[in-house]
């Protein structure tokens, strides 16, 4: 397929209204209007140092100290984030009966908060903490209490919000930060998300591919697709001949595979989903001029 440059959200509206079983794949660009920063620039490069790897988190106490210190400071704001117009528009798409599944690379659960039900959290969820020893789960809010009790004064630190529910703590020493162990077995506690270098659970991937098999088109919203765990679904869709549209500012890894690309605000481009389906579109000045020419 060849990427089609498009700047008019009506083209995207036509694409969506032509399909009834959309496989929607979302990324960080969906949540920026909720106050959660994204990761990449318009060229798909990193805006900040790369996220922690699974191997470093599990193998180095210093990495866990730094991760959980930043998370202690950033979690309260992240946990209070609310769904924005993009999340609500995609929930409306499901209510119209046009959604096969919504596969999100985000870990913020804002799609569910907006009312979406057919959601697969590809990379897990940040509001749950998992013991890597006994597999016990606990709410992130519960672990926040343990972190603050073990590290008095840290919650009062001020820092800019970062993408992973953490905060940009500069010039802070972490060597005395206390990371609470699992209260049951004493094991290492980790957010229940897929880190870089960690595999997405196979059953989750297979479930997503089953939905892709049943879909009649793919819609990418707010993702550069630079991470292979998300890109592979678009790659497979292209191989199977499915039409693919992307709504994203800047370059995506799949540009050469796209049927349609729209570089606009996600919320603005999807605003039509809040209206009842199949209503005639309002005529623009350009439409009227074209008809009278």
UniProtKB/Swiss-Prot annotation:
Binding, NAD(+): 27-47, 105-108, 222-224, 248-250, 266
Keywords: Cytoplasm, Metal-binding, NAD, Transferase, Zinc
Pfam (any one): SIR2
Residues annotated as domain Deacetylase sirtuin-type: 5-282
GO cellular component, one term: cytoplasm
Domain of life: Bacteria
Cofactor note: Binds 1 zinc ion per subunit.
EC number annotated for this UniProt entry: 2.3.1.286
Active site, renumbered: 123
Known cofactor(s): Zn(2+)
Family matches, as InterPro entries: DHS-like_NAD/FAD-binding_dom, NAD-dep_sirtuin_deacylases, Sirtuin, Sirtuin_cat_small_dom_sf, Sirtuin_class_II, Ssirtuin_cat_dom
One Gene Ontology term of the molecular function aspect: zinc ion binding
Localization: Cytoplasm
Function of the molecule: NAD-dependent protein deacetylase which modulates the activities of several enzymes which are inactive in their acetylated form.
Family according to the record: Belongs to the sirtuin family. Class II subfamily.
Classification via HAMAP family: Sirtuin_ClassII
Name the UniProt record assigns to this protein: NAD-dependent protein deacetylase
Organism this protein belongs to: Xanthomonas axonopodis pv. citri (strain 306)
Gene that this sequence comes from: cobB
